[in-house]
Swiss-Prot record:
Any Pfam family hit: RNA_pol_Rpb6
GO terms of biological process kind: DNA-templated transcription
Reaction(s) this enzyme catalyzes, per UniProt: RNA(n) + a ribonucleoside 5'-triphosphate = RNA(n+1) + diphosphate
Quaternary structure and partners: The RNAP catalytic core consists of 2 alpha, 1 beta, 1 beta' and 1 omega subunit. When a sigma factor is associated with the core the holoenzyme is formed, which can initiate transcription.
Organism name: Methylorubrum extorquens (strain PA1) (Methylobacterium extorquens)
Listed EC numbers: 2.7.7.6
This protein's name: DNA-directed RNA polymerase subunit omega
UniProt KW Metal-binding keyword: no
PANTHER family noted in UniProt: DNA-DIRECTED RNA POLYMERASE SUBUNIT OMEGA
Length: 136
């Protein structure tokens, strides 16, 4: 029964490898509870899937799209790149500046730090001191 079914399907899906992929995907869908589009006739799910493809009750293109969608684990979304974040200065003059009214917010300027400056600053940081709790 399966050999005749495969021969019928080769006319619909020319590549045997693709036919096997599509039929196995459809068989898994049937096992998961998808509705049948042909009579079962005591056939197992792979044979029913091949018969559905051969009788064109489901299209190979739809099955292919479903298969691709089921295999995708990550969908890449284009997001804009993050803008440079302003650096807060540790100078006494900057510390003296307090939040003011919203009209003054338009005139605020920030200092920017390059990546090299940031790396140099991180290198100059002292390592944290060890405590008794870290040894356990």
């Amino acid at each position: 029964m399966a050999r005749v079914t495969v021969e019928d399907c080769i006319e619909k899906v020319e590549n045997r490898f693709e036919l096997v992929l599509l039929a196995s995907h459809r068989a898994r869908l049937l096992a998961a509870g998808a509705p049948l589009t042909v009579e079962r006739d005591r056939d197992k799910n792979p044979v029913v899937a091949l018969r559905e493809i051969g009788d064109e009750t489901i299209t190979a293109e739809d099955l292919k799209e479903q298969l691709i969608h089921s295999m995708q684990k990550y969908v890449e979304v284009d997001e804009p790149e993050a803008e440079t974040v302003p650096l807060l200065s540790s100078s006494p003059a900057a510390a003296a500046v307090a939040p003011q009214s919203s009209s003054d917010d338009k005139n605020v300027q920030f200092d920017f730090m390059s990546e090299e400056d940031l790396l140099r600053g991180l290198e100059n940081l002292a390592p944290p001191t060890e405590t008794d709790d870290e040894g356990e």
